[in-house]
Amino acid sequence: GRGALIKAIHRACPSVTVECYELMPENREFLHTLNNVILLDEDFTKDSVGHYTKIIANPPFSGNQDIEHVRLMYDRLEEGGTLAAITSQHWKFASEKKCIDFRNWLKEVHGEVFEISAGEFKESGTTVSTMAVVIKK
């Protein structure tokens, strides 16, 4: 995206260096202008490097990409680490096998889920209802 999560992280922890991924070229170009940011590969799902103690993400929602990303991020999370991701609400209610499997998996890893009201991200140009998924490994 346009760095909203990065800016929020830097407001709380100004000296932290954030490693990030971004698919869209115009957003990648913008992210290069931010301080304390290391822009990694374009596609998180194709990069197998790195394990992290903290992961904060807003993955793409379409085609259940959000839940696929959450599971991949969990694999990259170090023991004792924390993952926080903004996701769609689709997986919470959908009857697709992938969504059912994700709900069951979240229970297994003791994931916490918080509803985010529609309009909460209006400043970023969206009014869609979302969820926050938080998992401690």
Tell me the role of every PLM-derived stretch.
Residues 1-137:
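Class I S-adenosyl-L-methionine-dependent methyltransferase catalytic core
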